[in-house]
């Protein structure tokens, strides 16, 4: 099961299927890592070979930063070093039955990478897209077969490059994190928790997952001078806001101090709401 736990093994699985990946491998000592940095060029990305999401991920821009990383890293952890990919993160997600048939699939689009959000103390948003790109579904379907995904949720991450091509990032045989399960529900007026229970108990899946709405998480941080108050946002778009909450401090660097979950049937309306929440003076 290494290929569902270790990023280095995932990379090999992606290549077996014929999907492009970022150049990289597990590193040894400082000199080994420095040699790869010279081969790929700065910046590079270093992250635990075994881990979830962006936890303990570092963007390294120089030899000095590389030296600092080796000074503070966990000595008992294996790390993988990769070339830095400049692209937008998109996902191929969903659920399969016991025979590996796709019961529904979905895609998320992230406005910026987690590293950029933390580095710049920036706001972020990501949304459930109503429209599934054909190339994403084609690649995702191949991965489901390669990883033999049966009766479970899946969450495959990719970079969408400026030229439109895809580079595989990570495979997770679980639902996406955060509020994504709830966002799928709000995007469909569905109850996936009950639907999954029905699937496990009876083998049937009756949820209607046609995505009549876009659904988006939008963050706010207390340090930014927003043009519109929360009250003004709610007065104009309260009917589109399905959740507003104060985030626990442990999640604030990524998810913001406050989070809105919004939905809209049309893309432009979604972008208009995001703009009103996010625009600063």
Go through the PLM ranges and name each one.
Residues 195-281:
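Peripheral (often C-terminal) accessory segments that flank ATP-dependent C-N-forming ligase machineries
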Residues 2-9, 54-56, 115-117, 228-229, ...:
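Short, charged, surface-exposed secondary-structure boundary motifs
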Residues 73-78, 83-126, 134-166, 172-180, ...:
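Phosphate-binding core of ATP-grasp and ATP-grasp-like enzymes
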Residues 57-59, 80, 168, 217, ...:
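Conserved hydrophobic/aromatic beta-strand scaffold that supports enzyme active sites
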